[in-house]
Amino acid sequence: MPGITREEVAHLARLARLELKAEELDHFAGQLDDIIGAVARVSEVADQDVPPTSHPLPLTNVMRADEVRPSLTPEQALSGAPAQEQQRFKVPQILGED
């Protein structure tokens, strides 16, 4: 398979709206060629006996039982707040009222 050309890199750069210098075109052409070669080697692996998966290992959620535990009172939680109102943290308004 022929390598990636400067023109192909320039085309990709235009599509991505990137401005590349002439020396960068050569540099990225080599890098893209290496990446495509690596993907081609992975594609050559015998995969007929391997089922498609989204992860190499099975995923399991580790859950703990819900337990009621002591926590802060509203007064304790608000004690370090710079501003509070009606037992709530008061923060500056960031959204309009529209």
Swiss-Prot record:
Name this polypeptide is given? Aspartyl/glutamyl-tRNA(Asn/Gln) amidotransferase subunit C
UniProt keyword list: ATP-binding, Ligase, Nucleotide-binding, Protein biosynthesis
Q: What is its EC number?
A: 6.3.5.-
This protein's encoding gene: gatC
Q: Which family does it belong to?
A: Belongs to the GatC family.
Provide the catalytic activity annotation. L-glutamyl-tRNA(Gln) + L-glutamine + ATP + H2O = L-glutaminyl-tRNA(Gln) + L-glutamate + ADP + phosphate + H(+); L-aspartyl-tRNA(Asn) + L-glutamine + ATP + H2O = L-asparaginyl-tRNA(Asn) + L-glutamate + ADP + phosphate + 2 H(+)
Annotated Gene Ontology MF terms? asparaginyl-tRNA synthase (glutamine-hydrolyzing) activity; ATP binding; glutaminyl-tRNA synthase (glutamine-hydrolyzing) activity
Q: What does this protein do?
A: Allows the formation of correctly charged Asn-tRNA(Asn) or Gln-tRNA(Gln) through the transamidation of misacylated Asp-tRNA(Asn) or Glu-tRNA(Gln) in organisms which lack either or both of asparaginyl-tRNA or glutaminyl-tRNA synthetases. The reaction takes place in the presence of glutamine and ATP through an activated phospho-Asp-tRNA(Asn) or phospho-Glu-tRNA(Gln).
Tell me the subunit arrangement: Heterotrimer of A, B and C subunits.
Provide the organism lineage as a comma list: Bacteria, Bacillati, Actinomycetota, Actinomycetes, Kitasatosporales
Which GO biological process entries does UniProt record here? glutaminyl-tRNAGln biosynthesis via transamidation; regulation of translational fidelity; translation
Q: Which Pfam families match?
A: GatC
Which InterPro entries does the UniProt entry name for this protein? Asp/Glu-ADT_sf_sub_c, GatC
**Region of interest: Disordered:** 70-98
Q: Which residues form a coiled coil?
A: none
Organism of origin:
Streptomyces avermitilis (strain ATCC 31267 / DSM 46492 / JCM 5070 / NBRC 14893 / NCIMB 12804 / NRRL 8165 / MA-4680)
